[in-house]
Amino acid sequence: MSEDSRSQTVRELGEFALIDRINAGREQAAHVLLGPGDDAALLAAPDGRFVVSTDMLVEGRHFRLDWSTPTEIGRKAIAQNAADVVAMGARPTGFVVALGCPADTPVRVVEGIADGMWAEAVRAGGSIAGGDLVHSEQLVISVTAFGDLGGQGALTRSGAVEGDIVAVAGELGWSAGGLAVLSSGADVSDPAFAHALTAHRVPQPPYAEVIDVFGVHIPNALTDVSDGLLADLGHLAAASGVAIDVHAAALTDPELDVVAARLEADAGQWILAGGEDHAFVGTWSPATALPPGWRPIGVVTAGSGVTVDGARPAGATGWESFRGAGATAAPGER
């Protein structure tokens, strides 16, 4: 990055020069037929359908520049959208990004966000097809993700049936642990906190654990863990008209327990209600072998709601934008 770009503000460089800079040298994914530079982008829809998802991140609510680098923020913005697309059984193809920022925002901040977005988009199998850049009072990021079902049926939350095995791919609780470290004022350079901080700043959805089993090991229902395991399983159970019982013993994580002990916190609550891990959780017929990377954590039963070892959870179950998440939410980020 040039010294000029490190000292310039968005006002000084200008909207169109900044757009040119953050798009220079980028290579589009195969499904993006026409990227930035025209009135709109052009994406291929090989089987005539798109999976589409949108999320918005607001500075001070969903991220803080004193807690995360611009590149980390960009990666997180794409990851949470890509995870939604993959959870529907689609391969991410393209992303459209809208960014609002104050005029005195350093150009390097916008460049860092763009670099992070591109890195995660490529990791997910897509690219940034276009977007918008506007003036706003604070940093605001909106991402719309597109995905290709490849001729397969969409995976939804509504297909779980009684007797299904509930299984998860990816880590649980680590993002909440990282948020707890940042919120507590603990020493972020302590190696004991490194993995938790990375999990919160740059979630790593296990895309391959879903994409690689398309058409081979198909779950009856699937969702990603964004609001919290119990909350997201609650959405799945309600959509399917079933109940889900989670087995606490299947969710223990001794390494996360160490982090929680340092903060005098409850790792179990992070795992059950923390959210933002962007793991995937689904239900599978007991006659179907779980694919690699998936582990059983519970069972689908008759009834409604979610229980843990047969009992209704007493604490917070996850995040809700206008209510927060009780002890699992910290002022300034979520």
Residue ranges and their predicted role:
Residues 1-86, 331-333:
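N-terminal glycine-rich phosphate/pyrophosphate-binding loops that anchor nucleotide-derived ligands
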Residues 2-24, 68, 102-127, 134-141, ...:
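Glycine-/charge-enriched secondary-structure boundary and capping motifs
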Residues 25, 58-67, 148-149, 190-196, ...:
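Glycine/charged-rich beta-loop-alpha catalytic/anionic-binding loops adjacent to active sites
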Residues 42, 81, 89, 128, ...:
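Residue-level signal for inorganic ion chemistry
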Residues 45, 57, 92-180:
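Glycine-rich anion-binding loops of enzyme active sites
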Residues 144-155, 162, 192-214:
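Active-site glycine-rich loop that binds ribose-phosphate moieties when present
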Residues 176-194:
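Short, compositionally biased
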